[in-house]
């Protein structure tokens, strides 16, 4: 296994199976963040992740963190909060503000560089990247964004400025995504936050098999039309 240097003249990627074991999943470096290359990456279970000043690094970790949306873990406290929630949730209303929120809301620094922001804004303009917004009155208090691959959604980042705002974004999106045929959410690497919401780890090979099948199952185009999302109170 060796780290592959990508060419700017080809958007091809090496097989994810050739990724390094340490650091886990590092596959390649270089290339660019053009829409064509980013889409090629997501189609093959690969994503960019690098710090400011570093070369572009491409990853496909093993195991892979995923969330089956119908298995979102709704804790008792979160259920009580949601039933009296002061929030309103929307889809694709404010992509630029959501990615800004994700970039600026990490105390330890951010991997969302200016180049990353510009690249994903372009994907959004092309209809491939999407945002979920959480509002309190007219204030944006949380949200998340990611890239659609048919019935699979690749979550990229989320942020929260008020209590349970990012959890609310994921909860409401999971319900809406499931109702319209969505099957799986890619969480990339498991952390305590996503694990508490029901994310699990599966072998990379299994993730790639799910991706190959689900990306061939497009949701209705109207699913991504900007609108308010609702989740019935229980």
UniProtKB/Swiss-Prot annotation:
InterPro entries: Acyl_CoA_acyltransferase, Leu/Phe-tRNA_Trfase, Leu/Phe-tRNA_Trfase_C, Leu/Phe-tRNA_Trfase_N. Coiled coil: none annotated. The keyword Transferase applies. GO terms for molecular function: leucyl-tRNA--protein transferase activity. Keywords: Acyltransferase, Cytoplasm, Transferase. It is an enzyme of class 2 (transferase). It catalyses: N-terminal L-lysyl-[protein] + L-leucyl-tRNA(Leu) = N-terminal L-leucyl-L-lysyl-[protein] + tRNA(Leu) + H(+); N-terminal L-arginyl-[protein] + L-leucyl-tRNA(Leu) = N-terminal L-leucyl-L-arginyl-[protein] + tRNA(Leu) + H(+); L-phenylalanyl-tRNA(Phe) + an N-terminal L-alpha-aminoacyl-[protein] = an N-terminal L-phenylalanyl-L-alpha-aminoacyl-[protein] + tRNA(Phe). The keyword Acetylation does not apply. Functions in the N-end rule pathway of protein degradation where it conjugates Leu, Phe and, less efficiently, Met from aminoacyl-tRNAs to the N-termini of proteins containing an N-terminal arginine or lysine. Belongs to the L/F-transferase family. This is Leucyl/phenylalanyl-tRNA--protein transferase.
């Amino acid at each position: 296994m060796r780290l592959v240097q990508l060419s700017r003249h080809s958007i091809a990627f090496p097989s994810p199976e050739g990724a390094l074991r340490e650091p886990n999943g590092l596959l390649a470096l270089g290339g660019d963040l053009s829409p064509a290359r980013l889409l090629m990456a997501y189609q093959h279970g690969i994503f960019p992740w690098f710090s400011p000043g570093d070369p572009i690094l491409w990853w496909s970790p093993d195991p892979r963190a995923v969330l089956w949306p119908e298995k979102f873990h709704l804790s008792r406290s979160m259920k009580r909060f949601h039933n009296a929630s002061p929030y309103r949730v929307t889809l694709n209303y404010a992509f630029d503000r959501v990615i800004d929120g994700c970039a600026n809301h990490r105390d330890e620094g951010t991997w969302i560089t200016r180049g990353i922001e510009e690249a994903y804004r372009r994907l959004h303009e092309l209809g491939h990247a999407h945002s979920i917004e959480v509002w309190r009155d007219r204030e944006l208090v949380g949200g998340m964004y990611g890239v659609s691959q048919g019935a699979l959604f690749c979550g990229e980042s989320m942020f929260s400025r008020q209590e349970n705002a990012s959890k609310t974004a994921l909860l409401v999106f999971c319900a809406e995504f499931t109702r319209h045929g969505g099957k799986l959410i890619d969480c990339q690497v498991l952390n305590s936050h996503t694990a508490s919401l029901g994310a699990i780890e599966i072998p990379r090979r299994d993730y790639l098999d799910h991706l190959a099948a689900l990306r061939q199952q497009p949701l209705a185009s109207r699913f991504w039309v900007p609108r308010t999302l609702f989740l019935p109170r229980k």
